[in-house]
Each structure stands twice: as C-alpha cells, then as structure tokens.
C-alpha cells in the first residue's frame, strides 16, 4: 500500500534534484565578470532568465513536500527518519540554488551598472576635454592695453583653475577604471587606457599653464613699462615746474640760485635720457605683444615724451646761456665776495661736521676696542683739521685782497675771524681729546703689568713660605694656592702676549720710542713671570711628590693619563681655522692655556716618577705616557707658533686696512670739497692744494698692493667664512680706491679746462699742450724766459724736497714688486693635472697682468723723481727687476697656451726637439738687430750735446749706467 507513495516521492525528488543541478550548471557557466561588455550583457540576460525559473523550481519542491507528506502519512515509523532526512536535503539544496541564482545575477548586474556609470563619467570627461581643447587651441589674441591684458590673464587663470578642478574627477575615473579592470580585465580600462587619459589631461593642463605663464609675462612686461612711463612723466612734470620757476623776468630768485637750479636740472637730464632710452627698449617687447592700435598708441606716447624732453633741454640751454651772460656782467668784487662767502660756508660746514662726528663727548669706554676706536676717531679728526690749514691761509689771503676795496666788509671779516677762531679751538680740543684717549690706552696697557707686579709679590711670598713644609696639612693648604697662582700667571701671560702682538697699534698710538719702551718692559716682565712660573711649577712638583709618597702608583698614574687624554682631545679640537681676529686671539689664548696645563702635567709626571720603584710594568707605562706627552708638547708648540703668526699677520692687516680706509675717506671728502668749491678764479690755489693731495697717491697705491697681499695671506689662514669676509673687505677697498682715482681724474680734467680758459683769455702768450700731461705740471711754455741758473736752483730745491718721497716710493715699489714676483713664482710652480687647474692658473696670470699698469704707474713716478736727483744704482736694479718680471709674466702666458694638463708648466717644461743649430740661428737673428739698434742709440747720444749745449748730461749717461748694471749682474738673462 505504501509502494505507490514511495515511488511518487522518489520520482519527485529525482525530478527536483535534476532540475536544480541543471540550473546550477547554467549558473556556473554564466558566473564570470571577465570579458567585453557585450559578453557581460549576454551573461546578465542569461542569469536573469535563470532567476525567472525560480517559480518553476519552487513548484517542484512543493511537489516533493506534498509527496513526502503523503508518504509519511502511510509509511511505518522506522522509515520516517530517512524520509525526513531526504526532505531536509532537498530543502537545503533548494535554498542553496536560490541563493546562488540571486548572488550570481546581482554580481553580474552590479558590475554591468558600475561599468555603465564609469562610461557615463568618462564620456562627460571627454566632452569637457574636447571643449577645453577647442578653447585653448587658438593663438593668444593681441590686446589693446594693460587693462585688457589683465582681463585676458584673468580668463586664462579661470580656465587653469577649471583644469585643476577636473583633477579630482580624473583621479576618481582612474580609480574606477583600475577597479573595473581588476573585475572585468577589459582592454578599454587597462593601464594603457588609464595612462592615455592621464596624458591627455596633463597635455590640457600644460597648455593652460603655458597660456597663463605667457599672459603673466606679457602683463608683467606691460606693467613694468607702464610703471616706468608713469615715473618718467612724474619726473618730467617736476623738471618742467623747476624750469618754469626759473624762467621769466618776474622770477624773484637770485641769478646764482637760478643758475644753480638749472645746473641741478642739467645733472638730471642724462638720467632722464637714460630712463627714456630704457623705456624705448622695453617698448619693443611690449609692442610685440600688443595689438596694432595699442602699439601705435605706445609709439605716439614715447614720441611725445621725447619731444617734451628735447624742448625742455633747448629751453634750459637758452635760459642758462642768458643767466651766464648776466652773471659774467657782474663786477669782479662781487664775484670774489660770493666766492669767499661760499668757501667760508663750506668751511663752516666742514668744521661743524668734524665737530659733530669726531669731537662729540663719547660714552665712557669700557673695552680696549672702544678706547682704540675713540683714539682713531680723534686722530682722524685731528688729521682732517690739520689738512684744512691751507684753506685757512687761503681765506686770510682772500680777505686781505678784498680789504683794499672801499666797501664795508666788517660783517664778512667778523665771520672769517670767528670761523678761524672756531677752527683753532677745534684743533686744541681734538688734540686734548686725542691725548686723553692715548693716556687712557696707556693706562689700559699698563694694567696687566701692574697686575703682574702684584702677582710677583704673591708668588715670591708663596715660594718663601713653601720652602720647608714638614707636615701634610700644610701641603694641602698651600698646594691649591700655588695652583691658583699658576692659573693667574697663565692669564697674565695671555694678556701680555696679546699686548706684544699689537706692535703696529702701539707704534701708531704712542710712537716708536714709547711703544718700544713699553714692549721692552713687557718682554722683561714676561721673562720675570716665566722664571717665577717655572719656580712655582717646581715647587708644585716638589709638593706633589711629597703628597705622592702617601699614594700608590695606580692612584697617581690614572689622573695623569686622564689629563693627558683630555689635553690631546682639546688640542685636536683647536686645529681648525678661525673666522676673524677675535677668534684667532681666543684660539691663541686657549692654546697658551693648554701649554701651561701641559707644563703642569709634566711637573706632575716628574713628581710621580719616584712611585715607579723599579717596577718594569710601571716603568713601561710611565715611559709610554712621557712619549705621548712629548709628542703632544711638540704638536702644541707648532700650533701656538702658527696661531701666533696668524694673529700677528691679521693684526697687521686689520691695522693697515683701517688706516688706508680712513685715508681714502678723508681724501675723498677733501677732493669732493675741492670739486664743490672749485672755480676758475682761484685755479692756482686749487691746483696747488690738489697737487699736495695727489702727491700722496703713489705711496698709498703701493700700500694698497701690500694690504691686498697681506689680505691673501690672512685668507689662507682663515676659515672659508672668514676668507669670504676678508675678500669682501678687499673688494670694497678696491672699489673705494677706484672711486677715488675717478674723482682725481675728474678734478684733473677740471683743472685742465681752467688752464684752457686762461689760455684763451691770455692772448699774449702761446701755450703748447701735449697729451702726456704729468700730474705735477699741466702747462709747458717754451717762451718762458727763466734764467738757467734760476732753473738749476729750482731743480736743486725740488731735489732736496723730494728726496724723502723718492726713497719712500723706491721702498714701496720694491716691496710691491717682490710680492708680485713671489705670486708669479708660485703660479709657475703649479702643476696643471686637470683642465680645471689650467683654468685656475690662467685666471691667476690674468690677475697679475691686470696689475701691471699699476706697477708701471709706480715705476713712472720713480722715473719722474729719479732724473732730478741723478739715477741711483737702486733705481737701475729695480728697473732691471721690473723688466725681468714683465718678461717672465709674458712668457708664462705664452707657455700656458702650449702646455697640456698633466705636464709641468712654465719654465719647468723643456723642449727636447730644440737643437743647437736652431738655437744658434735664433740667437743670431735676435742679436744682430739689437746690436745695430744699440750703435744707433750711441750715435744719437753723442750728437745730443752738439744740438743743445744747455742740456744736462744726466740723460745721456743713463745708457752707460745700464752697461755698468749689466756688467755687475750675475743672474740668468731675462727670458
């Protein structure tokens, strides 16, 4: 009876299982998201159809359930568990199938939707890309003016901002593409597609950025040009107002003030011309980036400004000529009065400036540098006042000349007298302040000596007291006192050593005699200190040896070893180069302190030797410690010597640099004052004062070369930062010197113009000018009837007066030539292993060649003074050395072009191919023309006395002296 329900149940179960297996097989076939979009859509439709079969499967499962209910109702109890188990499996299989259908379809549908959204976003991005490319493709349109260019720039910046904003969308698209590629693996979203999208975006961004940069440059150029135009128009407006204020008959200003105003305006014209030329140069670039109408407007604006400037210049020239005519029509008396008043006013300003800058009461100086600064300031003021002495004499002479005229000059004479009295009082005050500063410096420098005297008394007393100390407590009492006295001795030694290094400063302040006496006193005190210091060290060693008797070797050796290691570390730390003079002085002080500590350590080591007690191990340790200590002492002595030499060189350099700077400043102020008060009326007095100032130039020029050489030595012994500072100081000094020489040349040209004006006025004499005008005299008058004996007397006076100048110039030139020659020798000795070395050597040779005109100028000054005194052997020696140096420098330049990297350069290089025959032929070719030339010169020298009887034989004998010099010369010939 149960067989039919059982068969129906089995049939329904098999049918349901077969259907579910078929569905799962179809799902497994379509369960894949890889591949192109069409395949994905096909799988999506298949899974959707499979999902639509779910009711059919549910019907089959329900049928199984009904069959199971019927079977369970009629089957025996022992079969029910099996039926229920099969029923449970069918339900579980059905749930799994339904879940698989849903998940498979949902996954494929989600990927398809994701892909669709990505395609929409990508299409939107490419629409934006095409739109942006169309916008950025056309060339930049030329605009009319600055405002339009700024608008165009703003629009380009907006486009660039839009491009920057699209970066977020692009990053999102790239992320989605990478995610899709991981799921579908389609080539449309692979890495190449992503890179293409990124490259296209970068191209658009670069194009937008390039457009913005170009428009920014165009706008910036136009802004700079417009700012220059506005500034020039303001200047032009101000000049027009000034010129209008000086024009017309109704102008209330005095003629001199109007003429001065016009001269000031004339000084501004070159600046205006330069500004206009600069604007015209800038306009070329602006016009290229401007529309034709805007370019026409710019060109018209420039032409209008040019016309206004030319019209203004013509108006100024016409008015200045008219005012000069009026000014020349005034009387000579009024001209002299005004000149005297102007010079008096200038003199008052100079006195006021000197009183304010150099004679104001300064704060109480606390340090040595402040005291030296005060003394230098007072000395510079005193020198400046002394240099104004010729001006005082000139004021008195001009006042005497004006007194003969029948006019009331009492106010003017009172002003002159009051100014001269003020000048005298300032001289007295400056001398008093300078002497007071020198006294303070003397007391400051004497203070270490006084402290040393007190220390000597204390040290002698300690030596007397510690002569015999029987008990141990006394040793512990006096040993720290001796150590303190030794520390004070080291401090005093540092102070006295620094004082000895300031020899140039002491000589400059106190003079040679007092400075020498002070340095001798310091040296004697140093010797006394050294004796007492050594005595204290011996006494300390003795006391320590007494204390050491109560210790063992290990307790005494370990502190000595630690102290030696500490000294070695500190000495190693002091081997670096310092930046400036205070750093070098501090380093020297530290090294001297280390020396004192080394002496103390040596005394302690000697005190510890009795503890060895013939122990070989202890003896070996002690010997090793002594060896290390001696090596440290030698290294420390070398360091101290080098540091002391470096400090001394730096002190000398700083002192001479400061002196030369002060001289340049004072001389520049004097020359500026002469240029400001210069006029053709007092040309002779101005010329005399100018020659007096210029006479110091050769000596200072030689001093400049020495300072530069000392500066290079200081740079070699300084740190890179310090060398840069010294190099900057030398550069500033050279610029100041060049500015001073330019000022000298301008004044020289001005005085020449005065002589030309006087020559035009004086038609009774015929002046002869040459291009080679010496600085000591500007006019050569062949018709001057000076008797021969008077001329000889003048020459003798000039010879006596210039003897000291000649000797000083001779020494300066010799020192300068020695420094330059040593530099050349070092350059020749260089080994050019690389092309960089060759370029370095070439640059150094070019620097030496650039200073040859400077040496030639110094040598010409020597020759100018030499013939008046007769040619000396020293001058002939210097002449030969100078000729030899120039020849060696020239040959070094030629050999530089023939040498290759890695070979010895200069005169070290030999030429093996040069044979004896070639050398002989070259010597003959050179010697024969020289012999003919020498014979011709001898003939001319013999004929000179026949042509001019009153000619001195000095010049004729110069050539014979050169033969004498060559006979005495034993060195190699010049190359």
From Swiss-Prot:
GO terms for molecular function: actin filament binding; cytoskeleton-nuclear membrane anchor activity. It comes from the Eukaryota. Its main location: nucleus. Expressed in aortic endothelial cells (at protein level). The keyword Cytoplasm does not apply. InterPro entries: KASH, LINC-complex_assoc, Spectrin/alpha-actinin, Spectrin_repeat. The chain crosses the membrane at residues 926-946. Residues 947-975 are perinuclear space. One of its GO terms (cellular component) is meiotic nuclear membrane microtubule tethering complex. Pfam families: KASH (PF10541), Spectrin (PF00435). The disulfid bond with SUN1 or SUN2 is required for stability of the respective LINC complex under tensile forces. The keyword 4Fe-4S does not apply. It is a single-pass type IV membrane protein. One of its GO terms (biological process) is regulation of cell shape. Gene3D superfamilies: 1.20.58.60. Residues 617-645 form a coiled coil. Residues 917-975 form the KASH domain. Spectrin repeats lie at residues 220-325, 647-740. It is found in: Nucleus outer membrane; Nucleus envelope; Rough endoplasmic reticulum. Keywords: Coiled coil, Disulfide bond, Endoplasmic reticulum, Membrane, Nucleus, Repeat, Transmembrane, Transmembrane helix. As a component of the LINC (LInker of Nucleoskeleton and Cytoskeleton) complex involved in the connection between the nuclear lamina and the cytoskeleton. The nucleocytoplasmic interactions established by the LINC complex play an important role in the transmission of mechanical forces across the nuclear envelope and in nuclear movement and positioning. Probable anchoring protein which tethers the nucleus to the cytoskeleton by binding PLEC which can associate with the intermediate filament system. Belongs to the nesprin family. The KASH domain is involved in the binding to SUN1 and SUN2 through recognition of their SUN domains. Core component of LINC complexes which are composed of inner nuclear membrane SUN domain-containing proteins coupled to outer nuclear membrane KASH domain-containing nesprins. SUN and KASH domain-containing proteins seem to bind each other promiscuously; however, differentially expression of LINC complex constituents can give rise to specific assemblies. Interacts with SUN1 and SUN2; probably forming respective LINC complexes. Interacts with PLEC (via actin-binding domain). Interacts with DST. Interacts with SYNE1 via spectrin repeats. This is Nesprin-3. It comes from Homo sapiens. The lineage of its organism: Eukaryota, Metazoa, Chordata, Craniata, Vertebrata. The gene is SYNE3.
